[in-house]
């Protein structure tokens, strides 16, 4: 049996999630990612952040959303950090990605 990981999400992700997805689309994504935690591309120099393309509102992956997430597989967790439409943001900066990882790591140490 394939290992399934716990999906956790930041308040920022929660805020935007249902803007882009129906509840059904969201559940489909979470199930896929829980079974395939390394499906997205690793973002260079980001401290372990990954990005995956996913459909939104019937548009294909290229016109859908980008989901930014962070694996803590040794703890059995995948953290959904944020998501955005390709039309809104082309790429998050290295500095933004590093700040997301720092904030997440700080929360683990609290």
What is the predicted function of each stretch?
Residues 43-82, 88:
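Basic/aromatic recognition patch in beta-strand/loop cores that engages polyanionic ligands
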Residues 6, 14, 51-53, 109-110:
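Localized chelating/binding microdomains
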Residues 12, 21-41:
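Compact soluble domain cores
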Residues 9, 25, 29, 61-64, ...:
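Amphipathic alpha-helical interface surfaces
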Residues 1-24:
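Arg/Lys-rich, positively charged N-terminal/basic patches that mediate binding to nucleic acids
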Residues 71-110:
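Enriched for short, Lys/Arg-rich terminal
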Residues 36, 47-50, 100:
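Juxtamembrane/interface motifs at transmembrane-helix termini
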């Amino acid at each position: 049996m394939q290992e399934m990981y716990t999906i956790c999400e930041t308040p920022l992700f929660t805020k935007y999630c249902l803007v882009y997805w129906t509840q059904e689309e969201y559940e489909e994504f979470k199930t896929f990612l829980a079974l395939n935690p390394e499906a997205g591309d690793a973002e260079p120099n980001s401290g372990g952040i990954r990005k995956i393309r996913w459909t939104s509102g019937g548009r294909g992956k290229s016109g859908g959303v980008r989901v930014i997430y962070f694996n803590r597989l040794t703890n059995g967790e995948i953290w959904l950090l944020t998501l955005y439409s390709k039309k809104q943001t082309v790429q998050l900066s290295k500095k933004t990605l590093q700040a997301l990882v720092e904030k997440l790591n700080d929360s683990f140490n609290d």
